[in-house]
Amino acid sequence: MSLLTEVETYVLSIVPSGPLKAEIAQRLEDVFAGKNTDLEALMEWLKTRPILSPLTKGILGFVFTLTVPSERGLQRRRFVQNALNGNGDPNNMDRAVKLYRKLKREITFHGAKEVALSYSTGALASCMGLIYNRMGTVTTEAAFGLVCATCEQIADSQHRSHRQMVTTTNPLIRHENRMVLASTTAKAMEQMAGSSEQAAEAMEVASQARQMVQAMRTVGTHPSSSAGLKDDLLENLQAYQKRMGVQMQRFK
């Protein structure tokens, strides 16, 4: 796996799924392939994206700045600086300086990542802030190692939180989660449907599912009433895909 492929993998792991994720993936691919060289336009685009947390925007801004060649005097962006200030905690800044000194001695991506993984997310963000604000310089490989270590920590905590939700025994949370998943799957079906004859059928199924979820939320139903809702939808989706000659098992 190449260095840039690895960086793209880690960065995308912290971006929530949806159309925006696909857009960001495309932007990253273009940047890494040297196709997008207008850093200012890229940062302006990133700044106005909805849904993303300030830290995720800060990390993406840092990656874009590292990768896109720019004029020396190009101004640093406030939204990235604010996201990478470690919540203004002086302890984070102290640790960030210590980490920065270690990163100065690291020249490889994996070496830098290993060193960085032993620090807190706040310290890692502050360290990125130091480099972003040109208070210090490290090799691009070391900076990418720092980025990937930060993303790994964020993805770990997101995964723990997701696992807690999936394994919860609280019937109300499970019920709502099933309805949200059914609704998301329905939306995906509508987006994939396109404009063929069978598409009308897929759209109909998706639309009915969304109406059912809406009704269940409006009226309030028993927590077990949503059981099987997403699975039924998936069966319909897969039957539709088979007829269209498409095989996608990814929604499972």
From Swiss-Prot:
It is a peripheral membrane protein. It comes from the Viruses. InterPro entries: Flu_matrix_M1, Flu_matrix_M1_C, Flu_matrix_M1_N, Flu_matrix_M1_N_sub1, Flu_matrix_M1_N_sub2, INFV_M1. Its main location: virion. It is found in: Virion membrane; Host nucleus. One of its GO terms (cellular component) is virion membrane. The keyword Transmembrane does not apply. Disulfide bonds: none annotated. A motif (Nuclear localization signal) lies at residues 101-105. Plays critical roles in virus replication, from virus entry and uncoating to assembly and budding of the virus particle. M1 binding to ribonucleocapsids (RNPs) in nucleus seems to inhibit viral transcription. Interaction of viral NEP with M1-RNP is thought to promote nuclear export of the complex, which is targeted to the virion assembly site at the apical plasma membrane in polarized epithelial cells. Interactions with NA and HA may bring M1, a non-raft-associated protein, into lipid rafts. Forms a continuous shell on the inner side of the lipid bilayer in virion, where it binds the RNP. Determines the virion's shape: spherical or filamentous. Clinical isolates of influenza are characterized by the presence of significant proportion of filamentous virions, whereas after multiple passage on eggs or cell culture, virions have only spherical morphology. Filamentous virions are thought to be important to infect neighboring cells, and spherical virions more suited to spread through aerosol between hosts organisms. Belongs to the influenza viruses Matrix protein M1 family. Homodimer and homomultimer. Interacts with NEP. Binds ribonucleocapsid by both interacting with genomic RNA and NP protein. May interact with HA and NA. Cannot bind NP without genomic RNA. Most abundant protein in virion. When expressed alone can form virus-like particles in transfected cells. HAMAP family: INFV_M1 (MF_04068). This is Matrix protein 1. The lineage of its organism: Viruses, Riboviria, Orthornavirae, Negarnaviricota, Polyploviricotina.
